[in-house]
């Protein structure tokens, strides 16, 4: 870890606890800052609070007193806290310095960074890059939105390691100096409009990933979205991926993945399922080539890596029916990919947090949907969608109830697909929890012998 002294003896307010706020507070204390943590929830019974207080960190919970800003000129904001929250809104008005936990990870580490963002595919790309590093003798440590707090991992890496960091639009907002050596934008579509208010704001948040890059760095992006992704701020060397044509970067031609005219692998030898994953694979391969991962390790990974939990995850078979957990599909594009992945009749479990989206764009992908079981805040919207297409629609209270109701309508060879097209926060704390509940309920219905 770098001996960063820029925060020594400074008063710093961490807004929002959770995992990233907890680790950020501990790191700030280690860097010599005077730390206060604030969370709108009552944390009086939280074990983490006692741990922080034992380190001399003050914790104020249950509300956001604006007086906390009087003596704390530096704010570290948890990515899940919107800028519209009163204390952050007031900090902006006062012109206070607002950092992110991801920014801290950059300030304390000399390790080069591969940063991955995008509306869809970023977790798959990040995981695949990590697997390719694992198959080599190089070290690539996963961090960020994938579940490993960036500022914690950054304290553990060597300067010769790579930090492989998944970044959400929330984490990219507010970065100042953060500079990945290799940045990947998988794609940009409409998402998180409840947080960003409009599509332009969301797109601009994603573009933050390359704002500090120089000519010595790389941006990897989808060739067919280059007009959306690129801007005047872009200084890095841009390389593209495409499944449709030859590009300056990496592409598929005659059934092979090709880089600089060299065939790397036949696409028939890939294990990761789904046409949409070809783009994810191309992005990961190109990043690893640039990072110096041997081609043999890349091929070893591509012929063994089968995917990640909660992303079109095969859960199991009950009689003749296969169940798939796609709980990470928190927007319509991800669900389009899921619905497009099966030729069998589908019982589609969908619904969740209402972000103001309409779902008519899913209609062209519903041909194989035989029935829908809908739940969550968007239950009525999905019921209306299903009825408009002549589908059988059943309403459920939640994911567990949805799996129960599936048993009443299921027919031989139906695929049962949880692909909510919505975030989980109306009923579950995370999409992982939602997916685990689906799996638990599936197992509860397995016959006992």
UniProtKB/Swiss-Prot annotation:
Its main location: cytoplasm. Gene3D superfamilies: Mur ligase, C-terminal domain (3.90.190.20), Mur-like, catalytic domain (3.40.1190.10), NAD(P)-binding Rossmann-like Domain (3.40.50.720). PANTHER family: UDP-N-ACETYLMURAMOYLALANINE--D-GLUTAMATE LIGASE. Keywords: ATP-binding, Cell cycle, Cell division, Cell shape, Cell wall biogenesis/degradation, Cytoplasm, Ligase, Nucleotide-binding, Peptidoglycan synthesis. The gene is murD. Pathway: Cell wall biogenesis; peptidoglycan biosynthesis. GO terms for biological process: cell division; cell wall organization; peptidoglycan biosynthetic process; regulation of cell shape. This is UDP-N-acetylmuramoylalanine--D-glutamate ligase. Belongs to the MurCDEF family. It is found in: Cytoplasm. InterPro entries: Mur-like_cat_sf, Mur_ligase_C, Mur_ligase_C_dom_sf, Mur_ligase_cen, MurD. ATP binds at residues 118-124. SUPFAM superfamilies: MurCD N-terminal domain (SSF51984), MurD-like peptide ligases, catalytic domain (SSF53623), MurD-like peptide ligases, peptide-binding domain (SSF53244). One of its GO terms (cellular component) is cytoplasm. It catalyses: UDP-N-acetyl-alpha-D-muramoyl-L-alanine + D-glutamate + ATP = UDP-N-acetyl-alpha-D-muramoyl-L-alanyl-D-glutamate + ADP + phosphate + H(+). GO terms for molecular function: ATP binding; UDP-N-acetylmuramoylalanine-D-glutamate ligase activity. Its EC number is 6.3.2.9. It is an enzyme of class 6 (ligase). Cell wall formation. Catalyzes the addition of glutamate to the nucleotide precursor UDP-N-acetylmuramoyl-L-alanine (UMA).
């Amino acid at each position: 870890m770098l001996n960063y002294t820029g925060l020594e003896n400074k008063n710093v307010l961490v807004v929002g606890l959770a995992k990233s706020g907890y680790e950020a507070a501990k790191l700030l204390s280690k860097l010599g800052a005077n730390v206060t943590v604030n969370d709108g929830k009552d944390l009086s019974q939280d074990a983490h609070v006692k741990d922080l207080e034992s380190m001399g960190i003050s914790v104020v919970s249950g509300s956001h007193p604006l007086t906390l800003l009087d003596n704390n000129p530096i704010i570290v904001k948890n990515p899940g806290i919107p800028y519209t929250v009163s204390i952050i809104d007031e900090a902006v008005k006062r012109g206070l310095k607002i950092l992110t936990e991801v920014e801290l990870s950059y300030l304390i580490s000399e390790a080069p960074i591969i940063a991955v963002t995008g509306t869809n595919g970023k977790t798959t790309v990040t995981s695949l890059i990590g697997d390719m590093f694992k198959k080599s003798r190089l070290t690539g440590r996963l961090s960020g939105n994938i579940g490993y707090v960036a500022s914690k991992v950054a304290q553990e890496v060597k300067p010769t390691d790579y930090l492989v960091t998944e970044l959400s639009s929330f984490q990219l907002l507010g970065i100042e100096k953060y500079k990945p050596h290799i940045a990947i934008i998988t794609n940009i579509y409409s998402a998180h409009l409840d947080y960003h208010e409009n599509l332009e704001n969301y797109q601009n948040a994603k573009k933050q990933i390359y704002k500090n890059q120089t000519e010595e760095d790389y941006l990897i992006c989808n060739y067919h979205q280059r007009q959306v992704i690129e801007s005047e701020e872009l200084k890095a060397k841009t390389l593209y991926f495409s499944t449709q044509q030859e590009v300056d970067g990496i592409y598929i031609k005659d059934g092979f993945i090709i880089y600089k005219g060299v065939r790397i692998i036949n696409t028939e030898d890939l294990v990761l399922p789904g046409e949409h994953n070809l783009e994810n694979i191309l992005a990961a391969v190109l990043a690893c080539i640039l990072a110096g991962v041997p081609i043999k390790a890349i091929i070893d990974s591509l012929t063994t890596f089968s995917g990640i939990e909660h992303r079109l995850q095969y859960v199991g078979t009950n009689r003749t029916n296969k169940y798939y957990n796609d709980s990470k599909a928190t927007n319509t594009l991800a669900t389009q990919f899921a619905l497009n992945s099966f030729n069998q009749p589908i019982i589609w479990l969908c619904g969740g947090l209402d972000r103001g989206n309409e779902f008519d764009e899913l209609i062209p992908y519903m041909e194989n949907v035989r029935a829908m079981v809908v739940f969550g805040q968007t239950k009525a919207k999905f019921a209306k969608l299903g009825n408009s297409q002549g589908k059988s629609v059943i309403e459920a209270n939640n994911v567990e109830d949805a799996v129960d109701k599936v048993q009443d309508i299921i027919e031989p060879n139906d695929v049962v697909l949880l692909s909510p097209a919505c975030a989980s926060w109306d009923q579950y704390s995370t999409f992982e929890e939602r997916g685990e509940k689906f799996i638990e309920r599936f197992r509860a219905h397995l016959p006992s012998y």
